UniProtKB/Swiss-Prot annotation:
GO terms for biological process: argininosuccinate metabolic process; L-arginine biosynthetic process; urea cycle. The keyword Zinc does not apply. The keyword Cytoplasm applies. Belongs to the argininosuccinate synthase family. Type 1 subfamily. It comes from Nitrosomonas europaea (strain ATCC 19718 / CIP 103999 / KCTC 2705 / NBRC 14298). This is Argininosuccinate synthase. Keywords: Amino-acid biosynthesis, Arginine biosynthesis, ATP-binding, Cytoplasm, Ligase, Nucleotide-binding. It comes from the Bacteria.
Amino acid sequence: MDKVKKAVLAFSGGLDTSVILKWLQDTYQCEVVTFTADIGQGEEIEPARAKAVQFGIREIFIEDLREEFVRDYVFPMFRANTIYEGEYLLGTSIARPLIAKRQVEIAQQTGADAVSHGATGKGNDQVRFELGYYALQPDIRVIAPWREWDLTSREKLLTYAEKQGIPIEMKQKAGSPYSMDANLLHISYEGRALEDPAAEPEESMWRWTVSPETAPSEPEYLDLEYERGDIVALNGERLSPAAILTRLNQLGGKHGIGRLDLVENRYVGMKSRGCYETPGGTIMLRAHRAIESITLDREVAHLKDDLMPRYAALIYNGYWWSPERKLLQVLIDESQVNVNGRVRVKLYKGNVMVVGRDSRTDSLFDPDIATFEEDGGAYHQADAAGFIKLNALRMRIAKALRRC
């Protein structure tokens, strides 16, 4: 095994990464730097510092990345109306590039020659992290313990922790019926009780949203203001990106918005069942399409829709730092220059309904032309005959030749 001098570990302080930290020290005999990112997972992260100190870690990085996460990753993704396989809003996928970037930057700052993560050898996250590492520092050494060790179950992890004297809180020992991951965009649930795709999840599983059945009986209206494709104000109050998403999560959760139960195709080849809560993101997606509907040229909007599945797959599969994703982002961002205005939505029992949209500066909606009433000659209906005949020409020729 090649000698590793120092490794930067993505460290949550939970069971898995606590075991990994000790395993790295024992197996590689290397110095470990811990990096803990606050991306809105809603958990106390300072205990990770205390645990790292217990392991004798001298270089401990704990960073609040919530604003950067939403501003530089979530918002750019939503400019494309991104959905994977028609349903998934990519809450886990979009968080990995930022974590990978900071790990590499910390490695460069501290002189580390390796990085390590706690993703399993079965999932997509190992790919997402490592594609990011290699894209940002091609010669970095990657240590993926789940692909090396024989600790293949939770029970084995707990046994190892006990033997090594690794402090594990009672709630970590008790575990959860699900494997969960959270950030400001979503919370996900996988594995264990969800491995039967035919079984309905228990209501107690959902943490961010109330059931639509028990949501308030009165609707709630929201006004969202857009500048260059991004939300900048909510109900007239200008807020930071992270504050906007936090507030939308609260409002969406209150009205039972954003629950999803799906089977997705993982990049590594298997199908996986997952449940997600993305209340704020669900509102954002619906509202963004609404503001685009009056500010984007038809062909630009259709081109974006054509490119979106490819863009979504790049993010899902871990290619955020690839040249093709960056190229698509330039195109997407250029399309948003005139996406300015206001959208009004109604939240009611799991539904997000667009009830109004306007743009004082960039609307392409012309009421004089679109009206069903007298238009004063703005649109000459007789002109449509030639348009229709020319577009029908190829079909008329084919019919004459009995090809259709």
